[in-house]
């Protein structure tokens, strides 16, 4: 890995040397920030899987159990690898993740396009399913690499505005689904029967991510090399209390002492976090982190499954809604919520307010919306309302959770900490997606009227348990440590 770091630093130094003659530090920050946002805006192709799955089922006869097997492998690649990716980003810089995204995005999409070209209806062999599964695993890995590289770049450029610095890339990532679903409506990507021409779609994404990967590498490598200048200017040092993680700033003003708390106190760092391995181990020993992980599994799993199986859900809930329209509605509501929650979390929790409100309250509201959204899937006559509720909850969760993690354990550790939490969507998505596929294949061939009611009753219960766990962590652990508002 040292060779990788030397290679990346060499290229980064060349980029920095060239740009230093043309761009000021202030503009360098802005350029890197906007390139990272644009990368997020194009990185959500994996979130269009519900559009891909409809074509795979209708055009090639792949059943929903196999489709959910492929979706589960993409979730494993997307989320289960994030702890390692986050740790690498903290130690070697986010530019390494940009290279990883190029290595896996481009060949995977091109291989998928060739596999699709060789398929015929009801003539799909196991080798084809394995090829799809492996490629979507790597596409998931590449998605996380590109997105996480952009997210960390944004968060580390403007650490004094955690909510917005995190919510803007998260919002752009959500918006990428909306833009992608509209892009897939173009006649170029359609076949004569109205379904997607996956050969053209996969080739398009292969070329797109080659370009975006290179741009993102330039952006993130510049940030890696300029970190010392960017993060140590006088204005930021004056606001160190606001920028520092809770367990640093609060410890200066609190008189309570606890051995467990002391082990968790993060330290401010410039490029590579001080005592990173030791602090990461202490984070893994924190019981509140494990309870927070369990809550994330129980709420994000149903949301991921809902998004991956949206086409099947519309059909089996007797709705006449258009799939592309519902994907757009869900993406739009998710995008608006991500942006709103980022700004609200910064404003409501600000220490400058007379009565600051903890970010956890926003998380509780998001979970309540998600519970209603899951419960209404088989009971509402207007599916657009269901898409809005579930999209809003999904977007809010992916904004508030990382903001809370950055506030509690520190932005300089965010790659490792938030990356570790990303095993939750992998576990949750796999479990709930396989469960959904089994329910549909076994029950919905007989009775379409209520075949999904049992499944969505259980997902609503899962989100309710998640809400209870959040309250326990906040009131039962963090509040006792003195962290009531953050």
UniProtKB/Swiss-Prot annotation:
Reported function: Probable transporter.
Topology of the protein relative to the lipid bilayer: Multi-pass membrane protein
Originating gene: MCH1
Glycosylation sites: 322, 390, 457
Keyword Zinc-finger: no
Positions of transmembrane segments: 31-51, 69-89, 91-111, 132-152, 164-184, 204-224, 280-300, 327-348, 357-377, 395-415, 417-437, 458-478
UniProt source species: Debaryomyces hansenii (strain ATCC 36239 / CBS 767 / BCRC 21394 / JCM 1990 / NBRC 0083 / IGC 2968) (Yeast)
Cellular-component GO terms for this entry: fungal-type vacuole membrane
Family annotation (InterPro entries): MFS (IPR011701), MFS_trans_sf (IPR036259)
Protein name (database record): Probable transporter MCH1
Cellular localization per UniProt: Vacuole membrane
Keyword Transmembrane: yes
Sequence similarity: Belongs to the major facilitator superfamily.
Gene Ontology molecular function: transmembrane transporter activity
Listed Pfam families: MFS_1
Domain of life: Eukaryota
Region annotation Disordered: where it falls in the sequence: 236-260
Keywords for this protein: Glycoprotein, Membrane, Transmembrane, Transmembrane helix, Transport, Vacuole
């Amino acid at each position: 890995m040292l060779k990788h770091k030397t290679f990346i630093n060499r290229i980064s130094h060349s980029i920095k040397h060239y740009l230093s003659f043309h761009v000021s530090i202030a503009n360098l920050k802005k350029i890197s920030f906007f390139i990272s946002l644009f990368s997020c805006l194009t990185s959500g192709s994996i979130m269009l899987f519900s559009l891909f799955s409809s074509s795979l089922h209708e055009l090639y006869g792949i059943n929903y159990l196999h489709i959910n097997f492929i979706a589960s492998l993409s979730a494993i690649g997307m989320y289960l690898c994030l702890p390692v990716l986050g740790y690498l980003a903290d130690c070697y810089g986010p530019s390494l993740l940009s290279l990883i995204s190029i290595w896996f995005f481009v060949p995977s999409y091109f291989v998928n396009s060739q596999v699709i070209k060789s398929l015929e209806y009801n003539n799909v062999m196991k080798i084809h399913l394995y090829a799809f599964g492996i490629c979507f695993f790597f596409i998931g890995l590449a998605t996380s690499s590109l997105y996480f590289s952009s997210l960390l770049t944004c968060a580390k450029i403007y650490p004094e505005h955690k909510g917005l610095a995190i919510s803007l890339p998260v919002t752009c990532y959500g918006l990428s689904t909306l833009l992608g679903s509209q892009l897939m409506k173009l006649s170029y990507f359609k076949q004569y029967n109205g379904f997607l021409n996956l050969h053209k779609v996969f080739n398009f994404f292969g070329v797109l991510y080659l370009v975006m990967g290179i741009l993102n590498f330039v952006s993130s490598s510049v940030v890696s090399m300029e970190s010392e200048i960017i993060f140590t200017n006088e204005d930021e040092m004056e606001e160190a209390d606001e920028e520092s993680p809770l367990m640093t700033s609060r410890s200066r003003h609190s008189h309570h002492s606890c051995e467990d708390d002391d082990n968790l106190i993060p330290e401010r760092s410039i490029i590579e976090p001080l005592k990173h391995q030791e602090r990461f181990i202490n984070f893994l020993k924190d019981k509140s982190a494990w309870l927070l992980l369990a809550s994330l599994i129980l709420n994000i799993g149903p949301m991921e499954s809902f998004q991956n199986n949206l086409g099947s859900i519309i059909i089996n809930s007797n709705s006449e809604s258009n799939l592309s329209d519902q994907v757009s509605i869900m993406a739009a509501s998710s995008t608006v919520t991500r942006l709103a929650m980022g700004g609200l979390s910064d404003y409501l929790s600000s220490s400058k307010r007379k009565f600051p409100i903890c970010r956890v309250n926003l998380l509780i509201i998001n979970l309540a919306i998600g519970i209603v959204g899951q419960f209404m899937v088989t009971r509402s006559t207007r599916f657009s309302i269901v898409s809005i509720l579930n999209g809003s909850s999904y977007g809010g969760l992916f904004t508030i959770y990382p903001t809370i993690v950055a506030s509690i354990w520190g932005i300089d550790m965010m790659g490792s900490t938030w990356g570790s939490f990303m095993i939750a969507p992998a576990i949750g998505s796999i479990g709930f997606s396989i469960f959904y596929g089994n329910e549909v294949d076994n029950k919905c061939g007989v009775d379409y009227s209520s075949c999904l009611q049992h499944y969505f009753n259980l997902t609503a219960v899962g989100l309710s348990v998640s809400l209870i766990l959040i309250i326990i962590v906040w009131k039962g652990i963090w509040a006792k440590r003195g962290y009531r508002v953050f």
